[in-house]
Amino acid sequence: NIHMYDCTFKQCSFDKCRITGSSFSESLLESCVFSDCTGPYSSFGACTFKKSSLKDCTLNESSFADAKLRGTALKNNVFSGCDFGGADIGGCDFSSSSISGARFSLSALKDVKVNYEQAIELAKLLGLKIV
């Protein structure tokens, strides 16, 4: 477990890293690439992602609470059970990622792209009854 609180990362590549339980809380991640990383139970709380991407990462049960992810490139990630409460995720495309059991703020879902199955799951989480 590594704790990198309030750090600045620019043009960093995290490739096949094991970041389980690590904390990047309140850090700036600018032009960073996370590729094929494993990091369940990690914290990206209140992080700011600028021109960054996450691809093929397994980050189940991690926290992105209050993070600024707007427009971050997301592809084929596992976000199962993650906390996105209060996060700015506008413009993010979760359609190729697993978000089973993830928690989102209702207001944050505007302009977020999800696939059909994810839309049904999110509707249930929001208390909608689909008939």
Kindly give the residue locations of the regions a language model identified.
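Tandem repeat scaffolds
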Residues: 1-131
